[in-house]
A protein has these predicted regions:
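Short beta-alpha connecting loops at secondary-structure transitions
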Residues: 55-59, 103-109, 119, 123, ...
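Glycine-rich phosphate/dinucleotide-binding loop and adjoining beta-alpha-beta core of small-molecule
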Residues: 1-104
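Short glycine- and Lys/Arg-enriched binding-loop motifs that mark or flank ligand-binding interfaces
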Residues: 24, 83, 101-112, 116-120, ...
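Charged C-terminal helix
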Residues: 147-177
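Short, small-residue alpha-helix embedded
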Residues: 57, 111-142
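Short, well-structured alpha-helical segments that form the helix of a local strand-helix-strand
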Residues: 69-76, 132-146, 161-169
Length: 177
């Protein structure tokens, strides 16, 4: 969406007006890191889905994975939000500092648009009445499972976001069993 003045103002207006769960990714997170006063406006139980670089822009660099996880837990607690830190074993933190690690997914999912798919899955789950933490945990798991199914069908090399999308129905069918 970009980080120009109009986009910053639009995000500020959204955060001022929206009282329900908000799911933020990509440039919205970059805007927060450059306009820290907006972080205070995040609605309770909002969900942020940064990759490690976006997260470091929000909280500063970490010396190691343990320190980064501690910063993730503290950020969730300080701002009453869910943080989905995308990576090989995506970590999810809640405001009570609980941590969940995902066991699904594969390196082929590190492709353009994969994070957008994840954000869409989480947003759809929130829209269907799941709590923020449930939507984050289930969304991350289903996204990874769809990626695993896609890798079985097409391989990891050359996987694209639409391969993950095409496997989401099967992933949810497996979940419903």
């Amino acid at each position: 969406i970009g980080k120009n003045k109009n986009t910053v103002n639009a995000l500020a207006n959204l955060l001022n007006e929206c009282k329900g769960t908000t799911v933020l990714d990509a440039d919205a997170l970059n805007i927060l890191s450059e306009n820290r006063e907006l972080i205070q406006l995040l609605p309770e139980n909002s969900i942020l889905t940064p990759h490690p670089k976006e997260f470091s822009r929000l909280v500063g660099n970490s010396a190691n994975d343990f320190e980064r996880l501690e910063k993730q837990k503290q950020f969730s607690a300080d701002y009453d939000v869910i943080v989905v830190l995308k990576g090989a074993h995506t970590s999810i933190t809640a405001p009570d500092k609980s941590v969940f690690f995902n066991s699904t997914g594969n390196p082929g999912m590190g492709t353009a648009g994969s994070g957008d798919v994840l954000t869409g899955v989480i947003t759809a789950l929130v829209a269907n009445g799941y709590s923020s933490i449930e939507a984050a945990i289930i969304g991350v798991y289903m996204h990874g499972l769809a990626g695993d199914l896609a890798s079985r069908q097409k391989g990891q090399t050359g996987m694209i976001a639409s391969d993950i999308i095409s496997c989401l129905p099967l992933a949810f069918q497996k979940f419903d069993k």
